[in-house]
Amino acid sequence: MKTKFRLREKEKIFKNIRENGYAILHNIYSKKRINRVKNSLFSMLNYIKFDDKITDLQEKYYQVKDYNPNLKAHFYDMCAFELETRLALHDPIILDLVKGYFGTDVLFSGRPAIHIHDSENERFLEPHQETNMFSKDFLFVWAPLYDAKNDQGGLLIYKNSHKHGYWKHKVDNKIGSTNINLKKLKKF
């Protein structure tokens, strides 16, 4: 796995972020690193509902969800404190990129979050901006644990929307989360 980007590679990444609002970095994490995150999440779920017959993280998630939705929700909340995810977020290659992008050695980090693609999830978020950050200047890092497909497990990014600053959000959906009027996003 790559441990550092060359200066030219960094400049290309930074240009993509400035122009498009994002950059796609392929294969940043090794399979070993991803498996450590998956295994840790699996262990958390297996602690909630032990079953030595199930060894797949996704299957385990649905088992816990069926067993006790409240405990599944607590698992989701606890993921922000799970160390393997934090280690991945704070991987030296990511930190080096962020320092280079902002031209600083001083970094602050938010908490990692897990997005679980579950079509039955009532807390599915509508289009929104990540606005609850330390600063207006930040980079959002998203790394799938499984290969993302067009119709699931992905993240929708509205190219160039970052050039319009912060959008007015509303709170009119069934879960009371902030979201952006979809009509305004049609131009992207």
Please place each PLM-identified region on the residue numbering.
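Short, structured patches in soluble enzyme cores that scaffold and shape functional sites
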Residues: 129, 143-147, 159
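Residues in and immediately flanking transmembrane alpha helices
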Residues: 39-40, 141, 172
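Generic beta-sheet signal
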Residues: 23-25, 139
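Short, conserved beta-strand element in jelly-roll/cupin
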Residues: 134-150
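Double-stranded beta-helix
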Residues: 150-188
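Non-heme Fe(II)-dependent double-stranded beta-helix
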Residues: 1-19, 26-127, 132-133
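A short secondary-structure junction signal
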Residues: 110, 120-128, 138, 151-157, ...
